Curated annotation (Swiss-Prot):
This is UPF0208 membrane protein PBPRA2797. Keywords: Cell inner membrane, Cell membrane, Membrane, Transmembrane, Transmembrane helix. Coiled coil: none annotated. The chain crosses the membrane at residues 41-60, 65-87. NCBIfam families: PRK01816.1. GO terms for cellular component: plasma membrane. The keyword Membrane applies. The keyword Nuclease does not apply. It is found in: Cell inner membrane.
């Protein structure tokens, strides 16, 4: 097994976030949509929270509380990283048997419709599931998807 760095987990999280289909049908089944929304929100908002926590203490000349404000700022800045890290770890996790069967069924449906796909994985991960789901929602019609959603 190869060693992965935290940086690679962040990159995998970004890739997984870009790949996962943001569909309401999947929201009840998988937590990814909530994590992706929270991570995107934290990426936009938390830098401002970090700056405001430090600047507010400086504006009120409360330099005694600056260490606590810097701690809050540091925590706020790490929140998007926590989401990316979780998504990166999740993307590399092997699917449980029930989801692996689901992955294979959807994969076979896409290929039976005549669409080209990468080779079927023996041990699919959540990233491959995201890719297959993304392709299914883009290339299959609603009647084909009714069986699963």
């Amino acid at each position: 097994m190869t060693q992965r760095t935290v940086w690679q987990d962040f990159q995998n999280g970004q890739q997984y976030m870009a790949t996962w289909p943001m569909r309401k049908e999947l929201a009840a089944i998988f937590p990814e949509q909530r994590y992706i929304k929270a991570t995107k929100f934290a990426t936009r908002v938390m830098p401002a929270v970090a700056v405001m926590s430090v600047l507010s203490q400086m504006a009120f000349n409360n330099y005694g509380a600056l260490p606590q404000a810097m701690t809050v700022a540091l925590f706020a800045l790490t929140m998007p990283l926590q989401g990316l890290w979780w998504l990166g770890k999740r993307s590399r996790t092997t699917l449980p048997p029930s989801l692996a069967i689901w992955y294979r069924e959807i994969y076979e449906k896409i290929t039976s419709e005549g669409h080209a796909m990468q080779p079927l994985k023996k041990q699919p991960r959540y990233l491959e599931l995201a890719e297959v789901l993304n392709r299914a929602f883009k290339q299959l019609d609603k009647t084909s998807l009714e069986r699963w959603f």
